């Protein structure tokens, strides 16, 4: 009986402490604390000498003098009330650490997450990893994603399939690296559009497999061109300017617009500074190199190649536009006449 009496105060203190901790963390229980008779009544215990003694109800302030028991109980309460951590909330942190390990700067990492906010962090990490496997450094990868944010919406499998297809065209890791840097849209284009361009280069322009590889490596934007316009550009170079397949490939001829090509070529032709080679590839005058025709600024072209003024070239371009417009209208009227004749025959 005496031992039971000694255990009662300890039990009473623990009960009071538990209630006090809960009241502090849960405000709406304070009113219940005031109304609870079990914590406000006096306890009667039996001391060691056998006489009864009354103990007042133990308040939280009194129990604060028991540091060891208080610390143990508070730790238990905190462990029970500790919220669960969602594993998905930790994924951005893991992705950030992975990007840092790959060599990305903090500013680039922040920008990567803002390029496509709706993209899952793990998907972003997968695309970045695939691009790095192509041989790119973090800086070119960041620039490619910034230039074409749609890359982040691809799956890793789609990236692998497109990379595999481009490798079949002869674009290995080194060449594929340049293609992605210059024209990242290659990875998000429809497969049929790429096939059409490759078909024109092979069947209409009669480029060899090696020529096609070199064209795509040197001028990746060719893949974005309309196949019919690409064919016309080749025909103009081959028949009007007398260029060979090798000339077209080595000078990156197909990357220039047909408007720029015609303006500068025809202008030189009318000035007597360019002549179409004969079947043997010979001319009566030395033609300027394609580099000095197309790969220079307009000011340098006029000063060094055409030896003409800006005003004269501007007037020529306006006249050339009128000629092409009239030619187009004439061609359209001829087609209408042919259609009418066919209808009359039917």
Curated annotation (Swiss-Prot):
* Gene Ontology, cellular component aspect: cytosol; mitochondrial large ribosomal subunit; mitochondrion
Which Gene3D superfamilies does the entry link to? Transcription termination factor 3, mitochondrial
Region of interest: Disordered:
321-346
Any idea which GO molecular function terms this record carries? Answer: double-stranded DNA binding; rRNA binding
Please report the organism this UniProt entry assigns to the protein: Mus musculus
Q: Which residue ranges are recorded for the region named Dimerization with NSUN4? A: 310-327
Q: Which BP terms from GO are recorded? A: camera-type eye development; heart development; mitochondrial transcription; protein targeting to mitochondrion; regulation of DNA-templated transcription; ribosome assembly; rRNA processing
Q: Which gene encodes it?
A: Mterf4
Please state what is observed when this gene is inactivated: Ablation of the gene is not viable. At 8.5 dpc, mutant homozygous embryos exhibit much reduced size, lack of heart and no optic disks. Conditional knockout in heart leads to severe mitochondrial cardiomyopathy. Premature death occurs at about 21 weeks and decreased body weight is observed from 15 weeks until death.
Q: Where in the cell is it found?
A: Mitochondrion
Query: What is its biological role?
Result: Regulator of mitochondrial ribosome biogenesis and translation. Binds to mitochondrial ribosomal RNAs 16S, 12S and 7S. Targets NSUN4 RNA methyltransferase to the mitochondrial large ribosomal subunit.
- Please identify the protein, giving its name as recorded: Transcription termination factor 4, mitochondrial
Q: Could you list this entry's UniProt keywords, alphabetically sorted.
A: Mitochondrion, Repeat, RNA-binding, rRNA processing, Transit peptide
| Family statement | Belongs to the mTERF family.
- Name a Pfam family for this protein: mTERF
* Stretches with biased composition (Acidic residues): 322-346
Q: How is the subunit organization of this protein annotated in UniProt?
A: Heterodimer with NSUN4; this interaction may be required for NSUN4 recruitment to the mitochondrial large ribosomal subunit.
Task: Name the lineage.
Answer: Eukaryota, Metazoa, Chordata, Craniata, Vertebrata
